[in-house]
Swiss-Prot record:
Its EC number is 2.7.7.56. Belongs to the RNase PH family. GO terms for biological process: rRNA catabolic process; rRNA processing; tRNA processing. It catalyses: tRNA(n+1) + phosphate = tRNA(n) + a ribonucleoside 5'-diphosphate. This is Ribonuclease PH. One of its GO terms (molecular function) is 3'-5'-RNA exonuclease activity. Phosphorolytic 3'-5' exoribonuclease that plays an important role in tRNA 3'-end maturation. Removes nucleotide residues following the 3'-CCA terminus of tRNAs; can also add nucleotides to the ends of RNA molecules by using nucleoside diphosphates as substrates, but this may not be physiologically important. Probably plays a role in initiation of 16S rRNA degradation (leading to ribosome degradation) during starvation. It is an enzyme of class 2 (transferase). PANTHER family: EXOSOME COMPLEX COMPONENT (PTHR11953), EXOSOME COMPLEX COMPONENT RRP41 (PTHR11953:SF0). Homohexameric ring arranged as a trimer of dimers. The gene is rph. NCBIfam families: RNasePH.
Length: 238
């Protein structure tokens, strides 16, 4: 039996709260069950040096976990003086995923930074970050349209992400921490709304998984992402 008696293909309860803070151009609190992430979008009229003069924009991301987002306190990475390899991997994943949903030429020479700060962690922090940051990015873009900075919407489509895995021989969707820590196979899937894949990260923690199990996990991920798209569209009024 899964935590909270969920079906194998059932994600946790998803809640997306827009305009959670007042200063950022986009601000979202996203909740996947007990995992909670604050995602903010900041617009700057500048691009990285390697893009100057090319007439296109940039979307990037940063990711971090608050010290007591976990069961025991973690030292802040700022206090350590460097980011962990895990943190750098996750923020690159978030950035790649969000760039896939934007026409960077239509964005013009400006950059949008998504800051994803984990308030409470119970598994799936990177997938929750992508899901919430996608909504925050839409809000930031809408602010540019409303103030006349952009004439056309550069958003190509929504992006969502979810974890899937094999736990006790069963393929399951949206793993909580207790499931993730016991998973024989763990996978994160990022998708566009039209069903195309942006990223598939899958690892056999125990026994290798079969081709058939891979297809089952991808199907579960598609079902889960489709439910997330419904939640995103509803909160955005689309």
């Amino acid at each position: 039996m899964r935590p909270n008696n969920r079906e194998n293909n059932q994600p946790r309860q998803i809640k997306i709260t827009r305009n959670y803070t007042k200063h950022a151009e986009g601000s979202v609190l996203v909740e996947f069950g007990d995992t909670k992430v604050l995602c903010t979008a900041t617009v700057e009229d500048a691009v990285p040096r390697f893009l100057k003069g090319q007439g296109q924009g940039w979307v990037t991301a940063e990711y971090g976990m608050l010290p007591r987002s976990t069961h025991s306190r973690m030292q802040r990475e700022a206090a350590k003086g460097k980011q962990s390899g895990r943190t750098m991997e996750i923020q690159r994943l978030i950035a790649r995923s969000l760039r896939a949903m934007v026409d960077l030429k239509a964005l013009g020479e400006r950059a949008i930074t998504l800051d994803c700060d984990v308030i409470q962690a119970d598994g799936g922090t990177r997938t929750a970050s992508i899901t919430g940051a996608a909504v925050a990015l839409c809000d930031a873009i809408n602010s540019l349209i409303e103030n006349g900075t952009l004439k056309t919407n550069p958003i190509k489509g929504l992006v969502s992400a979810i974890s899937v895995g094999i736990v006790e021989g069963q393929a399951v969707c949206d793993l909580e921490y207790v499931e993730d820590s016991a998973a024989e196979t763990d996978m994160n899937v990022v998708m566009m709304e039209d069903g195309r894949m942006i990223e598939v990260q899958g690892t056999a923690e125990g026994e290798p998984f079969s081709h058939e199990e891979l297809l089952t996990l991808l199907d579960l991920a598609k079902q889960g992402c489709n439910q997330i798209f419904i939640a995103q569209r509803k909160v955005l009024g689309l």
